[in-house]
Structure formats: C-alpha cells, structure tokens
C-alpha cells in the first residue's frame, strides 16, 4: 500500500488510483476509499465506473445511504445500462427501511437492464418489499409471475417459504401445509427439512388430523421433539397415560425439557398432587431460556395456595410481580396477591393489590369481582368515602351484587 501511494505521488496515474481504492475497499478502509476518490476528482481525471463504484460502496457500508445514492446518480448519467445503479439505489433504500423507495428503484432496475441476474434479483426483492409493505395480494401475484419466468431459480426455497407463511397467516392451513411440504421435498438442508416437518406436524395437530400429525412428526430427526409432540397428539386422542410417559422421557432435554416439565406439572396440579406438581414446575425454572417459566412460577404459587400455605403463595406471586417487567400475568398476580393477603388477614396489603388491579384493568372480566373485594375491604375498615366510590362503581357493573351492601351506604 505505501508503494502504491508513492507511485501516485510520482506519476499520478489514473489506473493506480483505481487500484488503490479497490485495495482500500478490500481492506474495509472505507474512509480512505472516499478520500482517495476525492483526490482523484481534484486532479481532474475523467469518469471511471470503478472509482465511483468503490466510493458508493464505501458510503453504503458506512451506512451513509444518501451519499451512496448521489454517487450512483453520477454513474447513471454516464452508463447506458442503468440497471445496476438503480438496483444499488434500491438496496440503499431497503437498508434504510424505506420500502416504498426500494420498490420504486427495484422496478426501475428490472425495466432498464439486459442483465438477467439484475432482472431476476430485482424481481425477487420486489416480492420481499411487497411483503414488508403487507401487500399480500401483490406478493402472491408477483410470485406467480416470478415462477413463470424463473421456474427453477435459486430463490425458489425462499419464495415457497414465503407463500406458505402467507397462507398460514391467512389461516389457510391446507395451502400452507402443501407449500411447506414442497419445501421439505425441495431442500437438501437437514435443518430446513426438520423445520418444515415440525411446522407441518404442528399445523396438522391444530387441525386435529391425528394420522398426518404422527406421519410428519416421525420425519423430524430430533427424538426429543418427537416425544414431546407425539405426547400432545396422544392427549388429543385421550391417551393421557401414554402422553405422561413421553413427557417423562425428556424432562432433562435442553431444548424441550422445560415444556415436558410444565406439562407434567399441569397434569399433577389437575390431579391435586400439589407437591409433585410443584416439583415439575420448579424444574421448569432451572432452564435458562423457557417460555414457560413465568407461568410455572405462577403455578407454584397456586400449589401453595391450594395447600393453604398463604405466606409461600404470596412469596411465589411476588417473584413475578417484582422480577418480571411487563408480565403477561400481571392482572392475575394482582388478584392472587390480594386474595392471599386477605387470607393472611393483612387488609392493607390486600387492599393495595386489589386497588392496583382496579386502577389498571377496568375493562377486564374480573373487574366487578375486584370492585366488590375493595368495597368489602372498605366496609371492614369503615372508610365511608371510599366505600361509596366502590359501591357506586359496583352498582354500574353488577347491580345485583351491589344491592347486598346497600345497608352500609346510608
């Protein structure tokens, strides 16, 4: 590199500038690439596509997309086939998440080039942009056209997956299954085949198509997944004892053990075997990443509540309240804390959590129940003003319940 710089100083050869910017670009030294192009321009050399390509790519990789586009506009004014420049402008808009801008320039790229690769790539990315713009009808129309023009393209797997996903999102399960099955047959990648077999298994399970759910679950290479999902299928058939055996086989599996333990905990909770149930829920919490951990912690609290160990129940529910930000169970937790503090005869704490629910969840189904709890609490502590507030609110949402307390509001 120093040698090249020296040569420039000696003879200012245009071709050396070109070589130098290409070397800087290869080394990911984007600032030097840009500075070298600026020197090239100051020396008055004429148009060089290689020089400006390097400059625009350097700006692009630095995330300076507007500057990158300005360079491509220079190239556009000099080039007969404008497809590549239009395509790169589209790419810059895409990376800015300006999908309307990207759409406009992918269209221009497709229409203004004889380069078959740029045409095909532009057509593909138009599909992806329409998908991001949520134009599902347009996506499917473009895919139909793309498949007619490029029947065996290297994009076919991606397109097939996209079609399947659109069908699935539209609740067209059978069409989605057909597309996922095509992708399963098409792909030679074991991970893709596994993912497709799993998705098809799950869709057939949702459809309660037991036979096909079993067939596709057996095509998955992961034994633990087979045990888990076939247990779900067995439950649909009412074969609960067989399902339990399957869950027990994978309680220590890193990927699916948390789900198996959660299902076992739920099973024994339903059987009122609270200690055994709690053991499985506690095991769920041992997994570093688990979608079931919050609900498992909640159910641990339920087991203690069922055993009338209200202090431990409160402790379990508080773990979620204090440690889980934006908990999806927040409304349930507030009710459980209110109820269990009530059973511990701590009326202040009970009131605190019922009040929080009352303030946050006025549209929820348990709002009337909580309002009544607050009314009873205020009657017990003889707080007349708040008593009237909750009575009047209860009168609006559950008049029959409110009338039981009319004698206190005189």
Where would I find each of the regions flagged by the language model?
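Acidic, polar-rich low-complexity tracts and alpha-helical solenoid repeat scaffolds
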Residues: 1-410
